[in-house]
Swiss-Prot record:
The gene is RPSA2. This is Small ribosomal subunit protein uS2B. GO terms for molecular function: laminin binding; laminin receptor activity; structural constituent of ribosome. Monomer (37LRP) and homodimer (67LR). Component of the small ribosomal subunit. Mature ribosomes consist of a small (40S) and a large (60S) subunit. The 40S subunit contains about 33 different proteins and 1 molecule of RNA (18S). The 60S subunit contains about 49 different proteins and 3 molecules of RNA (28S, 5.8S and 5S). Interacts with RPS21. Interacts with several laminins including at least LAMB1. Interacts with MDK. The mature dimeric form interacts with PPP1R16B (via its fourth ankyrin repeat). Interacts with PPP1CA only in the presence of PPP1R16B. One of its GO terms (cellular component) is cytosolic small ribosomal subunit. Keywords: Acetylation, Cell membrane, Cytoplasm, Membrane, Nucleus, Receptor, Repeat, Ribonucleoprotein, Ribosomal protein. It comes from Homo sapiens (Human).
């Protein structure tokens, strides 16, 4: 499909991205219309998708999207959680109209309802999950593009891009690749330079994992602030200027108390039957009398 043009050939970094995201890994079941997209089957029963066919169909889908004059007439739909973020990012990059979440029945066929819309091209993430828009597209002769796994039904699908449409990384990478090729064919970005948008922005993330990461980051920031607060110098608002005192002994007046001289006694000469409780009482009386000046 890419012809003999070297510019449209699949690069090595693209192959590495496909392999890292698991785009080549299909399911254990195989639809008869997807047989010519299969490269081989593993010993555990998983079918391996031929990435060369994936790249050719990706370029064909990009050419079909570029052929639409008004980018807003391209409808991109994903009812599954793994493709909703990728669909919104693709629409923001290419100007398409996204429908992330539940598709309202009758959007393409019921002219009475307020959500009625007539797009010129439909791109879905999963033909099995997005069967309602595919069925309505067949009623209004709307061309369709779909990311198809090995067990996906190809009914009402005009351009099937064989890939792993179950994994969050694979779905995000396929929408990123499709958006990049559309922008390259429009001339918005150059093929000589890599696209500055990373594929990680198209990946689905579980809200619970995001909350856990935010809580861990907040706890780490709090502990870091506490650690810095213990070792940093006190702020100037808490420092008070103290008067300079040349001699600290002059600042405090201590009352002078005469020191009494007690005769030295020979403890060995006292009898062993002496009452020890009487001696402290007499001394305590003297100390009380000596310290009357303090009061």
């Amino acid at each position: 499909m890419s012809g003999a043009l070297d510019v449209l050939q699949m690069k090595e970094e693209d192959v590495l991205k496909f392999l890292a995201a698991g785009t080549h890994l299909g399911g254990t079941n195989l639809d008869f219309q997807m047989e010519h997209y299969i490269y081989k089957r593993k010993s555990d029963g998983i079918y391996i998708i031929n990435l060369k066919r994936t790249w050719e169909k990706l370029l064909l889908a990009a050419r079909a999207i570029v052929a639409i004059e008004n980018p807003a007439d391209v409808s991109v739909i994903s009812s599954r959680n793994t493709g909703q973020r990728a669909v919104l990012k693709f629409a923001a990059a290419t100007g398409a109209t996204p429908i992330a979440g539940r598709f309202t029945p009758g959007t393409f066929t019921n002219q009475i309802q307020a959500a009625f819309w007539e797009p010129r091209l439909l791109v879905v993430t999963d033909p099995r999950a997005d069967h309602q828009p595919l069925t309505e597209a067949s009623y209004v002769n709307l061309p369709t593009i779909a990311l198809c796994n090995t067990d996906s039904p190809l009914r009402y699908v005009d351009i099937a891009i064989p890939c792993n449409n179950k994994g969050a990384h694979s779905v995000g990478l396929m929408w990123w690749m499709l958006a990049r090729e559309v922008l390259r064919m429009r001339g918005t970005i150059s093929r000589e330079h890599p696209w500055e948008v990373m594929p990680d922005l198209y990946f689905y993330r579980d809200p619970e994992e995001i909350e856990k990461e935010e809580q861990a980051a907040a706890e780490k920031a709090v502990t870091k602030e506490e650690f810095q607060g213990e070792w940093t110098a006190p702020s100037p608002e808490f420092t008070a200027t103290q008067p300079e005192v040349a001699d600290w002994s002059e600042g405090v007046q201590v009352p002078s108390v005469p020191i009494q001289q007690f005769p030295t006694e020979d403890w060995s000469a006292q009898p062993a039957t002496e009452d020890w409780s009487a001696a402290p009482t007499a001394q305590a009386t003297e100390w009380v009398g000596a310290t009357t000046d303090w009061s």
